[in-house]
Structure formats: C-alpha cells, structure tokens
C-alpha cells in the first residue's frame, strides 16, 4: 500500500482488505467511480477524527446514520454532513416514524459495524436520504465498510451511487 498523509491507498491489494471494504470497492469499481477506498492508519469513530486524519473540514465527512422505521422495521440510512446533526422529525416526515437502531440491527441490515457504515454495498438496500448540506463541498469522504476505510467522492457521485433523494434532514440553529 502507498501512504498518503494519514491514509494508505488500497490499489491492487483489494484481496487483503477487510470484507466490508472489498464490498464497497467492488461497488465503486462496477459503477465506474474513479476513486478506490483507502485505509487510514488508525480507526476513526467520529466525523472529527476522520476529518483530522484526512486533513479536511468535518463537514466534508459524509456520516452514514441508520435508523429503524417502526411501521415495517426497514433500515433508513441518512447520509449527513459531519458537522451537522440529523433532525429526526424531518426524517420521520419524509419516511415515516423512525427510532434509533442498535448495533445488532445495523450489522444485520447493512453488513457493516457502527463506525464503518458505508453509503453503498449494504447487505439489504435501505431507504436512503442525502443531506443537502453535503453539497456545500466539492469533495467529500465517506466510510468504506470499516472504521479505518474511507473513500473520496463528490456529493453528486453520492446521489448517483445511491439513487437517493437530497433533502433537508438536519437541525438548523437560530441565527
């Protein structure tokens, strides 16, 4: 692997990667996405940690947050900017009443552990919403199926890869 700052490029060593990262890499390759996942030197569990490791603003981290829809037990994925908090009332208005998803639900539905949930390559396709705040940036980074795995993309790529609508799903502070 070749080192790039705090990250290591995966390149041709895809078979040596964790299963989740390989799944994400396969989806990215099949879709013609120009970037492959990279493995960070250390696991990152927060948007701030990921941003620090990559040398970018926290808002450039695309956080993948899973909720559990109450009516049918479906997984609801909200992909939001790392410097924003999801407004659950806005999400509920768009997809129906949701609740928090525990680690077992997240792993069963996505195939990923919390801290490594990717916006793509889920075990079962979730209902997905994309935070419009991500479009403030030309370049963003998302988890690639492992707490150390990330990949680079544009917000428009996220929209194309997921087929999800872009919506106002975050809390706004009074100015």
What are these regions (language model features)?
Residues 1-175:
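Extended, low-hydrophobicity, polar/charged segments
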